[in-house]
């Protein structure tokens, strides 16, 4: 199987969230991440640019009535970097989660550019 994209987790932001999820939710997240790896044009239902941001995307996962969001961004075109994640409980994505994701993205690029 060839991959169009590589997906990595930056620090432990995503992993700390992921490790505490039920196995069935982890499996759906893995399925969705694999879809992002192998599909050139991922349907917006699973992977969508977050309006009003520069370069921030949300990976969308639904399991039953539960909705999960994983913030991500691109580096070097085909590298998807996972940031923070949360379980969505309201219609609108909480501003504090978006702000946190933007700070993580800034931290990633500042750290990368200082090397």
Features from the language model and the residues they span:
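Basic, Lys/Arg-enriched alpha-helical interface segments
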Residues: 1-67, 76-80, 89-115
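ATP-dependent carboxylate-activation loops
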Residues: 83
